């Protein structure tokens, strides 16, 4: 008896996450693209087979998801975006990886030394564009990133962030104004010069009958040397004695523990763009942004797609504030405005075999429901324009020197 054909269901096809070593990015392969056949899986972007399936061993409680309605829209947008990219033959522009600084990971059994320190220093999350939300990056891929010099890059970015905004400062906080003003002024005498001949900040020799400021640890400094120093850090330049610092004004009844995070995109033609944000611990739950990229309908460079948006979700998937401005209330909106920082910087990857590299530009993230700091955005754009001017000026001088040699 001939078998009756089964009617295809209308359920959403299952996706699998893969890491493409050719594209150096996460990709989603749909079940109807031949993933059920062994050895037939290929990257949907480069059609290469050098890919590895990512087995997510994390529990469902640690997954960071977005609401189901948003997932359906993201899945449909993702499939349409893949079709458009295949027709145009254009390589996708963005590949977001969420990086959090200062992870509170627990030391695993048998783990010690630098391995434990590096694992707790940063937390990695990724979104393959399938609409499943942010998930922890597998250990195998994290080791590849950290082993390729990625850790040094993150450390440099963290230092820049701490010095620029003071957020997530890993060193000493500034001394309080009252502590600085209370430092006694002493007149330098021969006995002072005998015990301490020069200022440790400017290294200039003290002159008798001049005025200096004395720390509680009895070390002397010029007034115009130690005051700027203590306004940045509260420790003595010589013995690291610490003065009282200002209380943390950002701490409130909710006890929000902010941590600096970064979002990294690959740019077309080489290079990376890095956006910074704050993540927080609220009620014991990590709050992370969902960054809508070109994959799921928030593309950059396409005027009809509108501006980029950032949505914040709790670890259980509760939407804090969506891209259309509908949030959980004015209280959470106020906290978001305090946390989100619109400063974005651009890094260019240097390629020694190329005579010229692609020009860089800063990418600014915007949101309908968040008040971004216009002054910070202007400062970032000015810095980017300065970099571009230096780049084109250097190329013009190189061309002029080459033409003079030929003539």
UniProtKB/Swiss-Prot annotation:
Enzyme Commission designation: 2.3.2.27
Location in the cell: Cytoplasm, Cytosol
Any one GO MF annotation of this record: ubiquitin-protein transferase activity
PROSITE patterns linked to this entry: ZF_RING_2
Cellular component GO terms held in the UniProt record: cytosol
Record bears the keyword Transferase: yes
Keywords: Abscisic acid signaling pathway, Cytoplasm, Metal-binding, Stress response, Transferase, Ubl conjugation pathway, Zinc, Zinc-finger
Pfam family, any one: DUF1117
Region feature Disordered, mapped onto this chain: 316-337
Zn finger limits (RING-type): 199-240
Phenotype seen when the gene is deleted: No visible phenotype under normal growth conditions, but mutant plants have decreased sensitivity to abscisic acid (ABA) and reduced tolerance to drought stress.
Mitochondrion in keyword set: no
PANTHER family xref list: E3 UBIQUITIN-PROTEIN LIGASE PRAJA, E3 UBIQUITIN-PROTEIN LIGASE RDUF2
Induction trigger: Induced by abscisic acid (ABA), and drought and salt stresses.
Enzyme superclass (EC): transferase
Function: E3 ubiquitin-protein ligase involved in the positive regulation of abscisic acid-dependent drought stress responses. Possesses E3 ubiquitin ligase activity in vitro.
Pathway assignment: Protein modification; protein ubiquitination
CDD domains, sorted: RING-H2_RNF126-like (cd16667)
Name this protein carries in UniProt: E3 ubiquitin-protein ligase RDUF2
Top-rank taxon, per record: Eukaryota
Lineage of source species: Eukaryota, Viridiplantae, Streptophyta, Embryophyta, Tracheophyta
Disulfide bonds: none
Catalyses which reaction(s): S-ubiquitinyl-[E2 ubiquitin-conjugating enzyme]-L-cysteine + [acceptor protein]-L-lysine = [E2 ubiquitin-conjugating enzyme]-L-cysteine + N(6)-ubiquitinyl-[acceptor protein]-L-lysine
Species, as recorded: Arabidopsis thaliana
GO biological process: abscisic acid-activated signaling pathway; protein autoubiquitination; response to abscisic acid; response to water deprivation
